[in-house]
């Protein structure tokens, strides 16, 4: 009781500055009035709890809604970040550390932040945008500087919400039981969405205009919510940036998830268990007793190949009833308005981590040429492609043929771009295209963008191009933070277009249509299955006006990944091993023996021509 009395004695000035808000369950809280980096006022609430802390026996379980509280909650402190690994590969280089969590790591991390333009007015009913961060489902937090919601909120007059959700094993361990049902991170997101749907009207939000938007694993999460019947009532529109439920890293089958638990159990020295007859009770007991840091330190043990994240959503029969491709084919998803897109150089960022022999850290910032010949390129490709492609010479040859540079001379940058496009198409762009195309074919309105501008404030080397994730800076208005960054006027104009398109979409379902009924200067056409028109998001001097409208993008290459290659793999699987042995022998005969015979025959012909020419000359 003394604590309650002291609380009200020492906090009246804060409470009068920002009035208390009582949630619909009666829980009181207050935030703070702050200024955006552009000098405009807003009200910010940080670290509002939406779930009970998932600690103790709640570790690995679905989240439980936060119980009501009586004492006013001080929502002015950034929340904990969920337990996760940090990127130390490039030391203290800002380009990598900017994605590391910037608040205390804890299992007690299920909180959300709310940004409201001006003062809270429950009668305004503004459109609401819920941000879902990326990070491969193994990292990420709502509090990163690049996700600072102040500029987007005040410049576009929207309410922005950003929630934390559990990542890695804490968010996605699947054991086929209530103590570890899988998809806990997705249930965290859904509980936050329910909180917003229930309470955002008290902050001035319109519960009939709630838009989910996310990037990478956040985009995959958003599209998974589109597939889940559990999520459908709690949002109305969706934006996916460089990720989809059909991305090869986004969802895994149950048997794979269970096998990964066994591998981690053995890696943690809990015992030595066979994959054939595992004891899941013993595995779960080990994980529940383990220190959080021990789990984090061993979380990558099950990973065997590039683009394979250890703990991701699973088709659990509850949150997800079927795989994403089946849902898209049959139209089992929320048909609404969808804004989707990808970046020009999606995978280069990841290649540098995966191929240290090709991209040594010691030379990373001083060199610009790393892949100088076909042999190095093929070696890198083989280190990056999934096993199901590598195990057959036919499928590997098809991929190499599709992406190998042909125009001579071939530069180091050509080889690098070919590798980037191969992996970027496979892991990101083509899956976003697949989602956009399915949504359109089943009657949903879709708008597609392609981000092609390399920012002047980009800290990564110039040869890396337009990286995965770096459209986020423009969407959240970073170029207008002129006290910290030195973007150009053109880049501020580009950021303004990004913010306006995204906010218009949240408000009206159409990036072109302003809330007052007027339209933007440049018209962004709807995406369709025939012309596949998209908006090239870049600075004005690169593609002025309607010249920014393109078709595709990457249409031919995505047809290769989504149609030709799967059909080839199916055909190869049907013919059986004897045919494959014969085919490999035939390939060797054609590529080695015949080539060798042809070489000697050509040499013989040249010799005969030379003799004839020499004879004619001598006899003349």
From Swiss-Prot:
Main location: other
InterPro entries hit by this protein: AB_hydrolase_fold, AChE-related_enzymes, CarbesteraseB, Carboxylesterase_B_AS, Carboxylesterase_B_CS, Cholinesterase
Signal sequence range: 1-31
UniProt-listed Enzyme Commission number(s): 3.1.1.7
Active site location: 216, 346, 468
A Pfam cross-reference name: COesterase
GO cellular component labels: extracellular space; plasma membrane; synapse
Keyword Signal in annotation: yes
Subunit structure of this chain's protein: Oligomer composed of disulfide-linked homodimers.
Similarity-based family: Belongs to the type-B carboxylesterase/lipase family.
Role played: Rapidly hydrolyzes choline released into the synapse.
Name the record gives this protein: Acetylcholinesterase 1
């Amino acid at each position: 009781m003394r604590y309650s009395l002291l609380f009200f004695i020492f906090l009246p000035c804060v409470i009068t500055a920002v009035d208390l808000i009582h949630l619909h369950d009666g829980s009181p809280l207050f935030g703070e009035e702050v200024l955006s980096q552009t000098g405009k006022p807003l009200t910010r609430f940080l670290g509002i709890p939406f779930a009970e802390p998932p600690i103790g026996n709640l570790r690995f379980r679905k989240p439980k809604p936060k119980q009501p509280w009586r004492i006013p909650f001080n929502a002015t402190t950034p929340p904990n970040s969920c337990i996760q690994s940090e990127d130390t590969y490039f030391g203290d280089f800002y380009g990598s550390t900017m994605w590391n969590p910037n608040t205390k790591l804890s299992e007690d991390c299920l909180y959300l932040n709310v940004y409201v333009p001006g003062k809270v007015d429950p009668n305004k009913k503004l459109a609401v945008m819920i941000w879902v961060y990326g990070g491969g489902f193994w990292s990420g937090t709502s509090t990163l500087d690049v996700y600072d919601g102040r500029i987007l909120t005040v410049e576009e007059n929207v309410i922005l919400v950003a929630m934390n959700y559990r990542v890695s094993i804490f968010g996605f361990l699947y054991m086929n039981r209530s103590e570890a049902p899988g998809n806990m991170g997705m249930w965290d997101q859904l509980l936050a969405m329910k909180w917003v749907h229930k309470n955002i009207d008290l902050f001035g939000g319109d519960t009939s205009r709630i838009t989910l938007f996310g990037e990478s694993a956040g985009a995959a999460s958003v599209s998974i919510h589109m597939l889940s019947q559990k999520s459908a009532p709690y949002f109305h529109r969706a934006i996916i940036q460089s990720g989809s439920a059909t991305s090869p890293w986004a969802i895994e089958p149950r048997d794979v998830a269970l096998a990964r638990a066994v591998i981690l159990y053995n890696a943690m020295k809990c015992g030595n268990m066979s994959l054939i007859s595992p004891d899941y009770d013993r595995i779960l007991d080990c994980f529940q007793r383990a220190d959080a840091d021990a789990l984090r330190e061993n979380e990558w043990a099950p990973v065997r190949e590039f683009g394979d994240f250890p703990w991701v959503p699973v088709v659990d029969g509850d949150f997800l009833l079927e795989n994403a491709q089946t849902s898209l084919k049959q139209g089992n998803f929320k048909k609404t308005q969808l804004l989707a897109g990808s970046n020009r150089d999606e995978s280069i960022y990841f290649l540098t981590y995966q191929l240290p022999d090709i991209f040594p850290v010691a030379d990373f910032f001083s060199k610009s040429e790393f892949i100088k010949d076909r042999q190095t390129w093929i070696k890198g490709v083989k280190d990056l492609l999934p096993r199901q492609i590598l195990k057959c010479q036919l499928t590997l040859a098809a991929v190499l043929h599709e992406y190998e540079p042909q125009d001579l001379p071939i530069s180091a940058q050509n080889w690098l771009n070919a590798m980037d496009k191969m992996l970027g198409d496979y892991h990101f762009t083509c899956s976003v295209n697949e989602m956009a195309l399915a949504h359109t074919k089943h009657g949903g309105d879709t708008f597609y963008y392609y981000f092609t501008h390399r920012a002047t404030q980009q800290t990564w080397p110039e040869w890396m191009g337009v990286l995965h994730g770096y459209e986020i800076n423009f969407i959240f208005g970073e170029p207008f933070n002129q006290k910290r960054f030195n973007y150009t006027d053109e880049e501020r104009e580009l950021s303004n277009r990004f913010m306006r398109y995204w906010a218009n979409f949240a408000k009206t379902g159409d990036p072109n249509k302003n809330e007052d009924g007027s339209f933007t200067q440049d018209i962004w056409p709807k995406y369709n299955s025939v012309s596949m028109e998209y908006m090239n998001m870049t600075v004005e001097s690169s593609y002025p006006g309607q010249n920014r409208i393109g078709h595709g993008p990457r249409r031919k290459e995505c047809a290769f990944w989504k149609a030709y290659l799967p059909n080839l793999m199916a055909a190869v699987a049907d013919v059986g091993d004897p045919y494959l042995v014969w085919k490999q022998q035939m390939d060797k005969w054609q590529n080695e023996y015949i080539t060798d015979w042809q070489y000697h025959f050509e040499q013989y012909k040249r010799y005969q021509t030379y003799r004839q020419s020499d004879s004619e000359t001598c006899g003349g």
